[in-house]
Amino acid sequence: MIFLLLLLWLIPVVVAVISRRYARPSLWRNTGIAFGLVVSPATLGLYALYFLGPIAALLGIVALPLHLLHGSPGYELAVRFGLVPSHTVVEGFMHLPIEAINGVIWSIVYGLVGWGIDAFGKSKHHGQSTTA
């Protein structure tokens, strides 16, 4: 299961490669949306490396605050919507509504950041003269 969560990191990389080739003007927006969709479960997988050994534990230590940051909005909203009971340990399929909400939230956030980078890049290149 840890391996599958770690494979999620490949999704934004693949989207970036495809966007670089076919949709260059929206490269960062597409990559940001893909990153936002997978960042919460992927950081959980990265945190699970903490238990595999001393070298992998370094990645796990870095991943813990990242998962706490990216996991809490989905959990709070899932509790408020009644999808997950409060004051219980979240395990198994109880992660699904939490991670779905996190995917929506963080894909919007990182998609907007990527859109801003794309817009800045367009304005930067738009101001340059193309005459030699």
Label each PLM-derived region with a short phrase.
Residues 4-23:
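N-terminal signal-anchor/start-transfer transmembrane helix
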Residues 19-33:
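Membrane-interface helix-boundary motifs at transmembrane edges
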Residues 31-36, 114:
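Periodic glycine anchor positions in long extracellular repeat architectures
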Residues 38-47:
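Aromatic-anchored segments of alpha-helical transmembrane domains
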Residues 51-81:
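Juxtamembrane non-transmembrane "cap" segments at the membrane-aqueous interface
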Residues 81-109:
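Individual transmembrane alpha-helix segments
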Residues 104-132:
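Cytoplasmic juxtamembrane regions at transmembrane-helix boundaries
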